[in-house]
Amino acid sequence: MNSVLVTSACVEFRATLARHIKPLQREDPERHSLEWFFLRYLKRVAERAHASPSAREVNGAMRGLTRFYVDSVTHNAVLTARFEDVLAAHRHALRAEQSAQ
């Protein structure tokens, strides 16, 4: 049963990423804007998340997104909400994966 929790947590994490990537893509942010870089980091995380069933495999990309957020985005309320949602989903997936072991 624990493997189902890990799988569903990873699926939820991937869905969270898609939920934030799609609207940003539709907005077509200006090149080199905060939104453009944020979208690039989200896409990198999504690529890693879809390549592996393990949430741990995404840690490096999440660290990159976190560093970008801390350095650049902290004063943008919309991107802050997006970042916090993605981070919470990743942490949930990690906890579910760890409890399965």
Regions found by a protein language model. Give the residues of each.
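Exposed, low-complexity/repetitive linear segments and helix-based recognition motifs
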Residues: 9, 25, 32, 44, ...
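Short terminal alpha-helical segments
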Residues: 1-35, 90, 97
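Generic L/I/V-rich hydrophobic alpha-helical segments across diverse proteins
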Residues: 10, 14-17, 21, 39-42, ...
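Eukaryote-specific, cytoplasm-facing alpha-helical/coiled-coil scaffolding segments in long proteins
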Residues: 38-44, 91-96
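Short, charged, amphipathic alpha-helical segments
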Residues: 31-40, 59-60, 84
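Amphipathic alpha-helical binding modules
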Residues: 59-101
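Charged, low-complexity interaction regions
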Residues: 23-34, 50-55, 73-77
